[in-house]
Amino acid sequence: MSKRKIKEEMLQVIAPEIYGPPKKEEQDYKPRKLKRVKKKKKDDDDELDDEVELLHATAPRRRVQWKGRRVKRVLRPGTTVVFTPGERSTRTYKRVYDEVYGDEDLLEQANERLGEFAYGKRHKDMLALPLDEGNPTPSLKPVTLQQVLPALAPSEEKRGLKRESGDLAPTVQLMVPKRQRLEDVLEKMTVEPGLEPEVRVRPIKQVAPGLGVQTVDVQIPTTSSTSIATATEGMETQTSPVASAVADAAVQAVAAAASKTSTEVQTDPWMFRVSAPRRPRGSRKYGAASALLPEYALHPSIAPTPGYRGYTYRPRRRATTRRRTTTGTRRRRRRRQPVLAPISVRRVAREGGRTLVLPTARYHPSIV
């Protein structure tokens, strides 16, 4: 046996490699014991028995009696009310408005503030629902707000009468053309009582089950002072005798119609605008600016357009042929300096004795 094996056997006898549980270290300090301190009872039991017992004693109030916001818990639609012990309830969600508009009692929910209409910090007195987002009259702009009119007269409501139009909620809104100014439309236009308005009834557009929107366009014919003034102005420019007689008759008819309408609708008299005859415009002294094109050279790949300036660029060929030089003696090639056109300049004296040399510029004939 080797010496190493003998040493291992001797060590196994003296200190065997068997590890038992670790020894616990003895604690040098003792745990401190806390004594409970009992409160002394007041010896006022006899006095309390003689007094009146208060059943609903209130706590001492603060200076400011602040109460938090009263929150009414509302169960959101779509949540499944199932009690599973040991599990949390799922997070609530709001429905998509495509699904909300599919309910048949949509208006009742909005009126009673149920379901999706039960949310919000502030209570809104008037609730509006956008039933239609289309614009059947894009050329008009609104002047007044869209007001809801009662379907029944107040006397009929008092008597408790019911009609077929009880479920209707008609709205009225005044609209004018977009291209006209609002001041001209409201101030200068007058309504002719004799003419009947043009009524156009559009088809019913379904919004929700049992709910639809129908647009009725009522076009009211109006007359403005500007149109009459332009009519008389155009009539006064006629020179032939027959046309002038017809024009005088037309002016008298328009004035008579205006006087009739002014007695009923408008109190101010009609104001006719008399303008001077237009003079013919003189001929121009210069041509169009687009005709003044510079002389330019086109790329060889571009074919020139007939009728326009410009030529195809062709590189100039030298008249003399290039001589072949011997390999021993090569001449140095010099670049030609470009031939520049003479530029007319002018000297401008500035403050401080400085003189600037500026080129003279050619201006367009329309620039003074």
UniProtKB/Swiss-Prot annotation:
Record's subcellular location: Virion; Host nucleus, Host nucleolus
Region (Disordered): 17-49, 307-340
Family to which the UniProt record says this protein belongs: Belongs to the adenoviridae core-capsid bridging protein family.
Gene name of the record: L2
Protein name as it appears in the record: Core-capsid bridging protein
Inducers of expression: Expressed in the late phase of the viral replicative cycle.
HAMAP family: ADV_CORE5 (MF_04053)
Remarks, miscellaneous: All late proteins expressed from the major late promoter are produced by alternative splicing and alternative polyadenylation of the same gene giving rise to non-overlapping ORFs. A leader sequence is present in the N-terminus of all these mRNAs and is recognized by the viral shutoff protein to provide expression although conventional translation via ribosome scanning from the cap has been shut off in the host cell. This protein is only encoded by mastadenoviruses, and may therefore play a role in mammals tropism.
Function text: Associates loosely with the viral DNA to form an outer shell around the nucleoprotein-DNA complex and links it with the capsid by binding the endosome lysis protein. During entry, secures the viral genome in the capsid until it reaches the nuclear pore complex, preventing innate immunity responses. Dissociates from the viral genome at nuclear pore. Might be involved in nuclear capsid assembly of the viral particles through its association with NPM1/nucleophosmin.
Keywords: DNA-binding, Host nucleus, Late protein, Ubl conjugation, Viral capsid assembly, Viral release from host cell, Virion
